[in-house]
């Protein structure tokens, strides 16, 4: 999974301060204001497109801290089918 993080970080031109994988029960990932990306340990058990979506989503928050128009536009550019993903945990 960290290989995918490196791929997406390069593609999105961001550099997370720390990437950690841990047990998460309510979310698939998060991005802190201090640049820490946290991914759910069981994310790796999901399909590759969903994993890419979550990683891209969290890393993109390093550039755009909200879910506004710029964020959704960039998500559509990088992960065109992201709106069809079932993100509920």
Predicted feature residues:
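Active-site-proximal or metal-binding-adjacent scaffold patches in catalytic folds
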Residues: 1-53, 62-89
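Walker B catalytic acidic pair
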Residues: 58
